[in-house]
Amino acid sequence: MKLLYFAWVRERVGVESETRDIPTNVTTVGALKTWLASIDEGYAYAFETPDIIRVALDKTLAEDDAQLAGAGEAAFFPPMTGG
């Protein structure tokens, strides 16, 4: 799966994008955040408060219970403000 990181999430993980093989037991957005947090210290720092990180699957906003099946891309970004 292609993974994209934006803003401070990108700064903390240290890469803009990457492609990773996702374990078969990681089936939801929430599980993906948890798995990514286990990779190393940078990922753990980026995902230390996973509930505030927004995720888009194939450019569509997704909640933590969204299924990953069929998705080719996940983008991670901090909350946005308008104005």
Q: Positions of the model-derived regions?
A:
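Ubiquitin-like/PB1-type beta-grasp interaction modules and other compact soluble beta-rich domains
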Residues: 1-82
